């Protein structure tokens, strides 16, 4: 996210960084809650064998006096995506690689076929195209998977793999070949 959504809210670490955490005060926290938490963003869940009327009584008891407040705050639109390449040398015996790009938002109708395509490409099954091509057929990676996340106004699709350092380029070659096949061949 920090690369694909560089210089936007989606690209920021939700945990913060050491410098910002040192500067964070109670006043900052209260201001954040006031600016970001409103009644139009509240979801209430009840799980278990509790009668609906009892749940409603409890909700009314604890939330009935909460004044209605509607947020006008909108997330900043992400900047134009500029492809980038970041390499970090960590003193490990493996390469952990992540390939990502912007994708369709929750409101885009093309997200549904992309969810399906993501499952075919590198979804949770052992029979995904990437798992079969990279791991099972060639034994190049410990793990390989893809993920698609749709946000309200943007999206992210990525492919992750873990491999020996010497096999990184081979993995990339096979992954790019599978992506090309998906793009150029008709699906059965």
Regions found by a protein language model. Name each.
Residues 1-71, 77, 87, 92, ...:
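Charge-rich, well-structured scaffold segments of protease-associated domains
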Residues 79-81:
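Self-splicing inteins and homing endonuclease
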Residues 84:
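Flexible, small-/acidic-enriched active-site or ligand-binding loops
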Residues 110:
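Acidic/histidine-rich
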Residues 113, 131:
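Phosphate-proximal small/polar/acidic motifs at interfaces that engage nucleotide phosphates
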């Amino acid at each position: 996210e920090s690369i694909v959504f560089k210089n936007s809210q989606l690209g920021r670490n939700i945990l913060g960084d050491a410098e910002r955490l040192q500067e964070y005060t109670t006043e900052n926290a209260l201001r954040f809650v006031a600016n970001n938490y409103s009644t139009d963003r509240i979801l209430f869940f009840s799980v278990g064998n509790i009668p609906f009327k009892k749940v409603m009584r409890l909700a009314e008891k604890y939330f009935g006096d909460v004044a209605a407040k509607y947020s006008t705050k909108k997330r900043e639109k992400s900047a134009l995506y500029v492809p980038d390449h970041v390499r970090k040398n960590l003193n490990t015996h493996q390469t952990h690689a992540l390939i990502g790009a912007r994708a369709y938002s929750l409101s885009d109708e093309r997200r549904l076929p992309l969810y399906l395509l993501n499952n075919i490409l590198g979804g949770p099954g052992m029979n995904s195209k990437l798992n079969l091509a990279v791991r099972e057929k060639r034994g190049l990676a410990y793990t390989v998977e893809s993920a698609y996340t749709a946000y309200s106004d943007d999206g992210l699709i990525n492919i992750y793999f873990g491999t020996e350092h010497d096999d990184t380029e081979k993995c990339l070659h096979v992954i790019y070949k599978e992506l090309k096949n998906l793009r150029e061949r008709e699906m059965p």
